[in-house]
Each structure stands twice: as structure tokens, then as C-alpha cells.
Amino acid sequence: MAPPLLSLPLCILPPGSGSPRLVCYCERDSGGDGDRDDFNLYVTDAAELWSTCFSPDSLARLKARFGLSGAEDIHSRFRAACQQQAVTVSLQEDRALITLSGDTPALAFDLSKVPSPEAAPRLQALTLSLAEHVCNLERRLAAAEETITSPKKNTQPAGTQFLPELDHQRGSSGPGVRRRCPGESLINPGFKSKKPAAGVDFDET
């Protein structure tokens, strides 16, 4: 049976800008009856794999010892520890010790080295899942950058939003402009133009 898909979150150790040496992640397997209590923590250096290798009985004993209600509690604690960079791992021969600390009491788990035939498909699944997550993040980042850099399209033609509406005003005077009556003086509006002077007739007696 193929290994289950990677269940985020995960973390790399040591945290920060240094070169990573270990990857810590978790898997939740669903049983045939839909039970989700099959839960394991994993640590890998990309060559070897360590696992908690929980059985239903050992997981039940772990929950009773730490006062946990279910595997979901371990998953949420692991997520919180990853976000707070509060995960530590110690490798010892064929075993590893992982500690989850942070804002809650620390939880410590013993991990055993997974045999190579079983570890190989799990490491392959981890690599493919990480590659898929990276590709999805790159696509989302490219879409976000395109949205930010592309100007919003304006459906109204450029230059028309500031033009006055002149069509209905053509052939009519604008507001406050009075039409000149025939014969009205151009110099003194409102007064009729006078007739041209006829001069003085000196021959008239």
C-alpha cells in the first residue's frame, strides 16, 4: 500500500537561515472504519527515516500518559510547536528523540529508525508532496504578482469622462447668454442702433 500523503505542517531543523539538516513532519492514517487515531511523527535527513511507529495500543498508552483526548491533540501540538520554532530533535544511533515545547507542557517522543525498504517509498512520497506544495505556492505567487502589477481596466473610453455633454447644447446658447435682437446695438446691448446722421441742410430757408 502506498504511503499516505504528507500532512502539513512540517518544520526544518535547525530553524533560521542556516543549512537545514532534518525535516520533521507528521502523518495521519485513516483506518478502514474511518478511525483517524493512526498517527505518527517522522524525522528524516533525506537519506534515513525515523518514526514513532505507533500501534493502536501504544498510542492509547501515550494519550493516557499525557492526558490527551486523541491523535488530533498531538497534531495540533505539533503544528503549534512548528509555528513557534519549538521543536527539537536528538539523534542517537538507531533512535531519535523529538520534543515539542512552546506555550504548553513539553511532549517527548521516542522514534525508531525505519528499515530501508519501508523508508524508501515514504521518502519518495515526502519529496513528491513537497514538490507539489512548492509548485502550488509558485503559481499562487505568480497570480498575486500579476494582480498587483496589472492596472485595473476602465470600461469607459479614455478622455470621455471629462468631456462636457455638448450634443444636447448644440444650436442653443449656453447658460446666461441672451440672444441679440435684430437691430440691437453691439456696443450698448439693449439699445436700438440709431439711424445714420443726415447732416445740416444750409440751403433751407
UniProtKB/Swiss-Prot annotation:
Disruption phenotype: No visible phenotype in normal conditions. Mice are viable, grow normally, are fertile and have normal lymphocyte development. They however show mild radiosensitivity. Mice lacking both Paxx and Nhej1/Xlf show embryonic lethality caused by severe defects in classical non-homologous end joining (NHEJ). The modification Phosphothreonine is found at residue 147. GO terms for molecular function: DNA polymerase binding; molecular adaptor activity; protein homodimerization activity. Belongs to the XRCC4-XLF family. PAXX subfamily. It is found in: Nucleus; Chromosome. A motif (XLM) lies at residues 191-205. InterPro entries: PAXX, PAXX_N. Homodimer. Interacts with the DNA-bound XRCC5/Ku80 and XRCC6/Ku70 heterodimer (Ku complex); the interaction is direct. Associated component of the non-homologous end joining (NHEJ) complex, composed of the core proteins PRKDC, LIG4, XRCC4, XRCC6/Ku70, XRCC5/Ku86 and NHEJ1/XLF. Interacts with POLL (DNA polymerase lambda); promoting POLL recruitment to double-strand breaks (DSBs) and stimulation of the end-filling activity of POLL. GO terms for cellular component: Ku70:Ku80 complex; nonhomologous end joining complex; nucleoplasm; nucleus; site of double-strand break. Phosphorylation may inhibit interaction with the DNA-bound XRCC5/Ku80 and XRCC6/Ku70 heterodimer (Ku complex). The keyword Amino-acid biosynthesis does not apply. It comes from Mus musculus (Mouse). One of its GO terms (biological process) is DNA damage response. Its main location: nucleus. Residues 147-159 have a biased composition (Polar residues). Residues 172-205 are annotated as: Mediates interaction with XRCC5/Ku80 and XRCC6/Ku70 and association with the non-homologous end joining core complex. The modification Phosphoserine is found at residue 150. Residues 39-81 form the PISA domain. This is Protein PAXX. It holds the Pfam family PAXX. The N-terminus (residues 1-115) forms a head domain that is structurally related to those of XRCC4, XLF/NHEJ1, and SASS6. Non-essential DNA repair protein involved in DNA non-homologous end joining (NHEJ); participates in double-strand break (DSB) repair and V(D)J recombination. May act as a scaffold required for accumulation of the Ku heterodimer, composed of XRCC5/Ku80 and XRCC6/Ku70, at double-strand break sites and promote the assembly and/or stability of the NHEJ machinery. Involved in NHEJ by promoting the ligation of blunt-ended DNA ends. Together with NHEJ1/XLF, collaborates with DNA polymerase lambda (POLL) to promote joining of non-cohesive DNA ends. Keywords: Chromosome, DNA damage, DNA repair, Nucleus, Phosphoprotein. Residues 147-205 are annotated as: Disordered.
